[in-house]
């Protein structure tokens, strides 16, 4: 998968990533960044997040590094379709030789594995950053090291995806709680309205011919709340003069149900 314009592409989901992941440092991300740096003997290991206007770090072994303008981001170039982005000498690569991180910051070596995730159940895979490492001297990177970085990158990708999924699940749970509270408020208002107006509501369960009453119907008929009634028994509460009206309207009501 490739992204022809990483900056423009990231603009479409940058806010969602920041909101879901959060910028607070977490031990599991810090641990993976530190393990990556240690394993390869690099001074800096990081998990970056590339947004439309900046790059920040979910984890980085150098606490003095917080964020940078997206124009200086090396990680965003990892979205060009290659599995890994490895630059053994940044001064010899035209894409990076004039980058302030190289000319002023002294960076010479970069290796990163892009992180692709789904931001929602219907989302396509999108790149959000990279598991990367930096050194201040040029260095070679063997095939075995590439394989190891790929495996670590998959671990980082799974970790980030799990964090996003957890945040989405929490949002869904909060929304369900809100909907339940709204439903309960509506039911309370309906019960209050029934009580004030002196009427009740009921419905027929077609599966077993059982009638479900609102609280006010129980009060009107002066029977214990919660007592279940079959349709035949429920109809016995009506005056004989009204039964013909009920029997006439009932088939019409049932046939008008939309499925």
Predicted regions and their residues:
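Regulatory sensory and allosteric helical modules in signal-transduction proteins
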Residues: 44, 50, 54-58, 65-108
């Amino acid at each position: 998968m490739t992204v022809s314009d990483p900056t423009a592409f990231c603009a479409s989901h940058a806010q969602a990533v920041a909101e879901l992941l959060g910028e607070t440092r977490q031990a599991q991300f810090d641990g993976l960044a530190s393990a990556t740096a240690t394993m390869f003997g690099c001074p800096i290991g990081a998990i970056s997040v590339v947004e439309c206007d900046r790059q920040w770090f979910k984890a980085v072994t150098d606490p003095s590094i917080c964020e940078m303008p997206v124009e200086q981001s090396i990680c965003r170039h990892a979205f060009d379709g290659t599995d890994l982005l490895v630059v053994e000498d940044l001064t010899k690569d035209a894409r990076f030789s004039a980058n302030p991180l190289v000319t002023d910051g002294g960076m010479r070596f970069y290796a990163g594995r892009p992180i692709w995730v789904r931001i929602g159940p219907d989302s396509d895979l999108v790149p959000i950053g990279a598991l990367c490492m930096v050194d201040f001297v040029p260095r070679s990177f063997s095939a075995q090291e590439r394989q190891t970085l790929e495996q670590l990158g998959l671990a980082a990708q799974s970790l980030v995806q799990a964090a996003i999924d957890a945040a989405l699940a929490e949002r869904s749970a909060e929304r369900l709680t809100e909907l339940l509270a709204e439903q309960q408020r509506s039911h309370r208002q309906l019960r209050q309205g029934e009580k004030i107006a002196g009427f009740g509501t009921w419905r027929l369960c077609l599966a077993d011919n059982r009638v479900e009453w609102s609280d006010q119907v129980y009060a009107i008929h002066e029977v214990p709340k919660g007592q279940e009634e079959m349709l035949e028994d429920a109809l016995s509460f009506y005056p004989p003069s009204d039964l013909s009206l009920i029997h006439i309207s009932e088939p019409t009501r049932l046939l008008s149900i939309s499925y």
